[in-house]
C-alpha cells in the first residue's frame, strides 16, 4: 500500500510539472503576440507607391479672398474669387537662400516643378498696367534691392523656359527683410485698401506685388 501511494504521488507530481510547463509555454507565446492597442499604435511598414511618389516640394494653393473655398461653402451665391495661385513650395534644408538655391539676376520659377500659375477671374491693374482676366504663369528675377515679377501666357509648362514674346507684363517691386526666417517658400494674398498684395516670402526675404481691382 505504501508503494502504491508513492507511485500515486509521483504520478501527481509529474502531472503538475507538465501543467506548469504548458502554462509557461502559453505565456511565452502571449508575449510574442502584440495586444490590439499595440497593433493600433504600430507604424505601417513603408512601401513603394506605385502610382505617384510624394514630392519633396508640396504643391499649394492661395486664393483671394483668403480661404475663398470655405467662404463659398458657408455662404450661398458667393461671387467668384479675384485670384487663385497654384505653386510648389521648396524648402531651405539648411541651405542659404542665395548662392545656395537662388542666384541674383537669374530667372526663377517662383516655386518648384511645374511653372507657378496665377488665375485672375476678373480684370486687374498692376502698377498702372491692365491685366486681362485669365491664366498666367508667374516667375521672377531676384535682384539685391528689388525683384522683377513676370506674368506670361505660356501656361501648362514645367520648370521655366522663358518665351518673352508671351509676356503679359513685367513689374519691379521692392524687397525687404524681416527677423523671421521661413523654411518653406510661401506666396499668399493680403488685403489692401485698393485690392490685394501678392506676398512672396522665403527665408527672411519678402517682396509684395500690388494688385488693384
Regions found by a protein language model. Name each.
Residues 156-195:
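Surface-exposed, gly/pro-biased binding rims or lids
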Residues 56-100:
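Early exported N-terminus immediately downstream of N-terminal targeting peptides
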Residues 20-24:
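Bacterial signal peptide processing site
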Residues 37-38, 61, 164, 194:
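Coil residues (strongly favoring Ser/Thr
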Residues 29-54:
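Post-signal peptide N-terminal segment of mature Sec-exported envelope proteins
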Residues 196-203:
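Short, exposed beta-strand-loop hairpins at the edges of beta-sheets
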Residues 103-161:
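Mid-length scaffold segments of soluble, non-membrane domains
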Amino acid at each position: 500500500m505504501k508503494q502504491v501511494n508513492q507511485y500515486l504521488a509521483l504520478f501527481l507530481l509529474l502531472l503538475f510539472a507538465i501543467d506548469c510547463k504548458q502554462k509557461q509555454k502559453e505565456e511565452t507565446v502571449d508575449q510574442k503576440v502584440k495586444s490590439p492597442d499595440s497593433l493600433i499604435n504600430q507604424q505601417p511598414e513603408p512601401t513603394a507607391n506605385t502610382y505617384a511618389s510624394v514630392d519633396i516640394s508640396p504643391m499649394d494653393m492661395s486664393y483671394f479672398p483668403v480661404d475663398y473655398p470655405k467662404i463659398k461653402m458657408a455662404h450661398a451665391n458667393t461671387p467668384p474669387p479675384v485670384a487663385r495661385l497654384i505653386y510648389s513650395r521648396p524648402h531651405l534644408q539648411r541651405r542659404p537662400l542665395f548662392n545656395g538655391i537662388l542666384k541674383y539676376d537669374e530667372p526663377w520659377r517662383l516655386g518648384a516643378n511645374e511653372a507657378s500659375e496665377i488665375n485672375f477671374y476678373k480684370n486687374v491693374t498692376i502698377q498702372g498696367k491692365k491685366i486681362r482676366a485669365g491664366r498666367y504663369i508667374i516667375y521672377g528675377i531676384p535682384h539685391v534691392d528689388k525683384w522683377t515679377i513676370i506674368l506670361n501666357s505660356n501656361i501648362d509648362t514645367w520648370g521655366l523656359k522663358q518665351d518673352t514674346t508671351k509676356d503679359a507684363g513685367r513689374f519691379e517691386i521692392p524687397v525687404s527683410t524681416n527677423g523671421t526666417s521661413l523654411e518653406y517658400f510661401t506666396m499668399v494674398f493680403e488685403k489692401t485698401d485698393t485690392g490685394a498684395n501678392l506676398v512672396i516670402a522665403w527665408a527672411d526675404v519678402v517682396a509684395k506685388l500690388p494688385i488693384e481691382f
